[in-house]
């Protein structure tokens, strides 16, 4: 009976007694894929409107086995990156240029949008890609909060100095008549 491959990481599952003289190499390949799935990093250039992360049974050169994926390149149209349709998770750094949208999805499934210049914690159930922090709710931070874009309040309040600490508050005008 020949080797088979695991569905999530494409690890080679050797049959007992198979691969005499080469089982060590095959085992090392499997260990390298496990290492990539836990701590691996790969940079992938987005070249077209639909790109697939490479995947290989038993090999160690596939892109999708890596935990961290940096997407680079210049988008020339709305694009989608796809991985295999299996359960997995990724940290994705969208470092592409161009003003087009970029989605990430399992093959044949539903994409999640990747915000330009942002890092995303993603997981897929094999049919839909999810951005874990997209709907995260309350966020607590220690230190200075810097916002590059607009801050919107939709039905919520804005509380200054909730802990009654001795802090200063300042609003500065940009010179417009209304502030």
Describe each PLM feature range.
Residues 2-102:
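Exposed extracellular interaction/assembly regions and N-terminal maturation sites
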Residues 6-8, 76, 109, 124, ...:
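Residue-level signal for pocket-adjacent positions within structured domains
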Residues 17, 45-52, 107-111, 127-179:
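Intrinsic low-complexity, repeat-rich intrinsically disordered segments enriched
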Residues 24-29, 116-126, 168:
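Extracellular disulfide-bonded cysteine-rich modules/repeats
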Residues 28, 80, 111-113, 142:
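Short, surface-exposed secondary-structure edge patches
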Residues 31-40, 98-106, 121-136:
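Short, surface-exposed terminal/edge motifs of secreted or surface/virion proteins that either
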Residues 67, 79, 88, 98-102, ...:
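The right-handed parallel beta-helix/beta-solenoid scaffold, focusing on the short coil/turn
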Residues 103-117:
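Short, surface-exposed beta-strand/turn "edge" patches of beta-sheet domains
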């Amino acid at each position: 009976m020949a080797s088979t491959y695991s569905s999530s990481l494409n690890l080679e599952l050797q049959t007992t007694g198979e691969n005499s003289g080469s089982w060590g190499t095959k085992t090392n390949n499997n260990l390298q894929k496990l290492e990539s799935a836990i701590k691996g990093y790969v940079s992938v250039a987005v070249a077209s409107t639909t790109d697939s992360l490479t995947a290989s049974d038993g090999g160690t050169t596939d892109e999708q086995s890596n935990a961290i994926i940096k997407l680079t390149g210049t988008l020339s149209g709305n694009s989608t990156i796809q991985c295999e349709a299996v359960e997995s998770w990724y940290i994705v750094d969208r470092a592409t240029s161009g003003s087009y949208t970029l989605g990430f999805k399992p093959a044949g499934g539903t994409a999640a949008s990747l915000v330009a210049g942002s890092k995303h914690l993603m997981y897929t159930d094999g049919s839909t890609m999810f951005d874990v922090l997209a709907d995260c709710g309350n966020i607590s931070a220690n230190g200075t909060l810097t916002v590059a874009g607009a801050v919107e309040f939709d039905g919520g309040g804005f509380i200054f100095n909730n802990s009654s600490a001795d802090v200063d508050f300042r609003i500065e005008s940009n010179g417009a008549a209304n502030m």
